[in-house]
Amino acid sequence: MENCKVIAITNQKGGVGKTTTTVNLGVGLASSGKRVLLVDADPQGSLTVSLGVKNPDELDVSLSSLMQSVIDDEPLAEGAIIRHQEGVDLLPSNIELSGMETGLFNVMSREYVLKNAIDGMRKSYDYILIDCMPSLGMMTVNALVAADSVIIPSQPNFLSTKGLNLLLRS
């Protein structure tokens, strides 16, 4: 599927609906016949837990594992993608992603690690949706580099729009 669209869902403010938007948009696209991969790029793993993974910290393979494979220039770890009953695939996250984000500061071309990890998956999907953490850290920068477009959920209040303005200026 060479026309795969990668979309990052981000806002520097927490609690504005990034994960909810990711899940609902993904399931909606899947119900209309699209092949969808949801990527949890937040070490809190809210997207992963939302899709029924009870203990994400016990997963053998996660987004962090795939990114480490890219950094080590090794084949991508297999078994990371979880098929969900709602018709979407999930690339889960767990607390290991916090260590990955910190470690990225010592990696050459660090902002391209996520892009390199998911580029090979584009042929299998119509859409790849990346649920970002509520900060403009290195993982969010990676998601923005990997993305073709961005959705910035916002609520009509001061702090939410402040997060939107900070992101747009970054």
What label would you give each PLM region?
Residues 1-170:
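P-loop NTP-binding core
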